[in-house]
Amino acid sequence: MGRTRENKEDVVADLKELLKESQLAVIIDYQGLSVAEITDLRRRIRPVGGTCKIAKNTLVRIAVDGDQNWQPMQEYLKGSSAVLLVQEDVGGIVKAYKSFQKDSKKTELRGGVMEGRSLTKDQVEALADLPSKEQLYAQIAGAINSITAKIAIGIKEVPSSVARGLQAYSEKEQGSES
């Protein structure tokens, strides 16, 4: 039994809403996956801020129609397509998908779309090497902390240098008086 028009409109509206909140869309071929495997994929990407949507290519095309950011997605919509939508950790979702792909060996990454640009399979896989938001925060905090430590050492060193200079001068004066 097919979907009703109302149901299809709900799917398109849901996709549009998810796309508004997403930074990246990754399109995969899910042919050959069982329901349990699709559920496993969804379970793996959810903790890193991702959503897996499976809808007819026609409905996905309708959802991205008129939105310049997601237009390039249409070139990847062939056959059995699942769309992985990333709201938060771009690198984390690609890592989660690659882990799933390594275990199942049934899916194929077609490409992705980010900020209106089409990404090839290799470009999407390269996103896995990017540090997560938490790692970037830690790096920034470490850099700020090291700067403040250097400033504190520098401030402490100035009076010490002046004191050593005065001490050397007074010793020199005492030596010349003798």
UniProtKB/Swiss-Prot annotation:
It comes from the Bacteria. One of its GO terms (molecular function) is structural constituent of ribosome. Keywords: Ribonucleoprotein, Ribosomal protein, RNA-binding, rRNA-binding. The keyword ATP-binding does not apply. The keyword Lipoprotein does not apply. One of its GO terms (cellular component) is large ribosomal subunit. One of its GO terms (biological process) is translation. Part of the ribosomal stalk of the 50S ribosomal subunit. The N-terminus interacts with L11 and the large rRNA to form the base of the stalk. The C-terminus forms an elongated spine to which L12 dimers bind in a sequential fashion forming a multimeric L10(L12)X complex. Forms part of the ribosomal stalk, playing a central role in the interaction of the ribosome with GTP-bound translation factors. Belongs to the universal ribosomal protein uL10 family. PANTHER family: 39S RIBOSOMAL PROTEIN L10, MITOCHONDRIAL. This is Large ribosomal subunit protein uL10.
